[in-house]
């Protein structure tokens, strides 16, 4: 193989590897895991029967907002609006049942 062809092939392989490494994130999942807000946008509604668990992260130095991340039964993580009245009622019920246990 001629040197220019080998360089072109190496560049193409490198580009392919970079694309594969960066395109693996499924849509609708929580993206950030660093010291910043994890919820870039929230879903207005979710079928609560599909929720496996909820994680509530209070405001702190990493993010000034309360974040609610729901893990769905299919393993997908989605951000929910912490101001939604139905979600607030569910969180209050969970907190009350946790205190009585």
Swiss-Prot record:
Induction description: By lipopolysaccharide. Expression increases until 4 hours after treatment and then gradually decreases, remaining high 24 hours after stimulation.
Disulphide bridges, residue numbers: 37-63, 39-79
UniProt GO cellular component terms: extracellular space
SUPFAM superfamilies (UniProt xref): Interleukin 8-like chemokines (SSF54117)
Function: Ligand for CXCR2. Has chemotactic activity for neutrophils. May play a role in inflammation and exert its effects on endothelial cells in an autocrine fashion.
Family, per entry: Belongs to the intercrine alpha (chemokine CxC) family.
Protein name in the entry: C-X-C motif chemokine 3
Naturally occurring in which organism (per UniProt): Rattus norvegicus (Rat)
Gene transcribed to yield this protein: Cxcl3
